[in-house]
């Protein structure tokens, strides 16, 4: 089982810019 990308590369959602 490969590690989730969320833990490997925590990037903000480009689809929904909260900022």
Swiss-Prot record:
Glycosylated sites: 15
Instruction: Offer a single GO CC term for the protein.
Output: extracellular region
- UniProt keyword annotation of Glycoprotein present: yes
Q: Which UniProt keywords apply?
A: Glycoprotein, Secreted, Toxin
Task: Give compartment(s).
Answer: Secreted
Determine if Secreted is one of this entry's keywords. Answer: yes
Describe tissue expression.
Expressed by the venom duct.
What GO annotations for molecular function exist for this entry? Answer: toxin activity
Query: What is the protein name stated in its UniProt record?
Result: Pro-rich toxin 4
């Amino acid at each position: 089982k490969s590690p989730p990308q969320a833990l490997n590369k925590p990037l903000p959602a480009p689809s929904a810019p909260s900022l």
